[in-house]
UniProtKB/Swiss-Prot annotation:
Pfam families: Adhesin_Dr, Dr_adhesin. SUPFAM superfamilies: Bacterial adhesins. Changing R43Y: In strain: 950 and 5026. It comes from the Bacteria. Residues 1-21 form the signal peptide. This is Dr hemagglutinin structural subunit. Coiled coil: none annotated. Hemagglutinins of uropathogenic E.coli mediate adherence to the upper urinary tract. These adhesins bind to the Dr blood group antigen and also agglutinate human erythrocytes in the presence of D-mannose (mannose-resistant hemagglutination (MRHA)). The lineage of its organism: Bacteria, Pseudomonadati, Pseudomonadota, Gammaproteobacteria, Enterobacterales. It is found in: Fimbrium. Its main location: other. Residues 22-75 are annotated as: Receptor-binding.
């Protein structure tokens, strides 16, 4: 009988204390963010450089772009040009006015083999890779109008 009375009392205490429980905010709020990516992550560096028109001769270097590809064991590292940066088999930097173009060649500086296919520049061999991609003037372009020009390359992998 005592045991039954104790159990009943405990149930009442739990029911009464549960009915009055509540959350009162009294601090800061934290946020957890997660970005889920492909296993093969290809990071493309930024390059900002100034050149005079007279320096835009055929094969003149515009500059190096760093590329770091990790987790690409069974994939071919690739860089894709924005649609505004590729036409008829050629890469180019586009002016801020979206009219003027500065044609360029893209090639690795380590003599590894790469291929261009419809605006995608990809490594012929599979596997992670880190190195420098050189951007070079394609043809004599000393008459290029002054202004700001941009080439946007997105890192990824090539899938046949």
């Amino acid at each position: 009988m005592k045991k039954l009375a104790i159990m009943a009392a405990a149930s009442m205490v739990f029911a009464v204390s549960s009915a009055h429980a509540g959350f009162t905010p009294s601090g800061t709020t934290g946020t957890t963010k997660l970005t889920v990516t492909e296993e093969c992550q290809v990071r493309v560096g930024d390059l900002t450089v100034a050149k005079t028109r007279g320096q835009l001769t055929d094969a003149a270097p515009i500059g190096p772009v760093t590329v770091q590809a990790l987790g690409c064991d069974a994939r071919q590292v690739a860089l894709k040009a924005d649609t505004d940066n590729f036409e008829q088999g050629k890469f180019f930097l586009i002016s801020d006015n979206n009219r003027d173009k500065l044609y360029v060649n893209i090639r690795p500086t380590d003599n590894s083999a790469w291929t261009t296919d419809n605006g995608v520049f990809y490594k012929n061999d599979v596997g992670s890779w880190g190195g420098i991609i050189g951007i070079y003037v394609d043809g004599q372009q000393t008459n290029t109008p002054p202004g700001n020009y941009t080439l946007t390359l997105t890192g990824g992998y090539w899938a046949k």
